[in-house]
A protein has these predicted regions:
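Conserved acetyl-CoA-binding loop-helix of GNAT-fold acetyltransferases
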Residues: 103-117, 139, 143
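Conserved GNAT acetyl-CoA-binding A-motif
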Residues: 120-130
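A short, internal acetyl-CoA/4′-phosphopantetheine-binding micro-motif in the GNAT/acyltransferase core
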Residues: 95-103
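A short, well-structured alpha-helix characteristic of acyl/acetyltransferase catalytic modules
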Residues: 1-52, 175-178
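Conserved active-site alpha-helix within GNAT-family acetyltransferase domains
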Residues: 134-150
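Conserved catalytic-core motifs of GNAT/GCN5-like acyltransferases
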Residues: 129, 147-164
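A conserved beta-strand-loop-helix scaffold within acyl/acetyltransferase catalytic domains
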Residues: 31, 35-87, 95
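Glycine-rich acetyl-CoA-binding "A-motif" of GNAT/NAT acetyltransferases
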Residues: 73-76, 136, 163
């Protein structure tokens, strides 16, 4: 299951490749384009935290981080997180897009591709965990057809010390496509 999830993906003008060292500088530069956004993320992929955060994501054998492309342009990143082969569940998260791609439909195309791959690989439940302060991401989850299951109060302490409430969304295999 995990091996299939880690394969490159492509479709609808976009693609996703598993993060490798050849992507480090380009992804770091893309993540630096919106330094203020990292305040509402659990981890800091801005210039002063990028290397530590990418190392943290890559350190878990249950995570797979992808570099995203719009055509030939490096567009951002997203990950399969906490892949649980026993429960057939995972989270899609750690998603960041360069500012000029937000609201362009890129998110929908990438998420469709990642969701389809997950379900085709045997996953039955996909979760999305969003800081309650992140209205844009919550709206995007609703557009995808994800069900808002509730709020995990004081769920985690983010990189900047904020005690975060997390909105939990999910999509089940038998609910997809919406």
């Amino acid at each position: 299951m995990i091996e299939q999830l880690a394969q490159p993906m492509a479709g609808d003008g976009c693609r996703a490749e598993l993060f490798g060292e050849q992507h480090r500088d380009g992804l770091r530069a893309a993540c630096a384009e919106d330094r203020n956004i990292w305040a509402i993320y659990a981890n800091n992929f801005g210039p002063d935290g990028f290397d530590d955060s990418i190392a943290l994501y890559r350190s878990s054998p249950r995570n797979r981080t992808f570099v995203l492309f719009e055509g030939h342009e490096l567009a951002g990143m997203s990950s399969y997180l906490t892949i649980d082969e026993g429960r057939h569940c995972l989270e899609i998260g750690g998603t960041y897009y360069r500012p000029h791609l937000r609201g362009s439909g890129f998110n929908r195309r990438i998420k469709n591709m990642m969701i389809e791959r997950a379900f085709d690989s045997g996953i039955r439940r996909i979760e999305f965990r969003v800081d309650v302060r992140n209205a844009r991401s919550q709206a995007a989850m609703k557009k995808l057809g994800a069900v808002r299951e509730g709020v995990l109060r004081a769920d985690r302490i983010t990189w900047n010390g904020h005690v975060r409430d997390t909105a939990l969304f999910s999509i089940l295999k038998d609910e997809w496509p919406v």
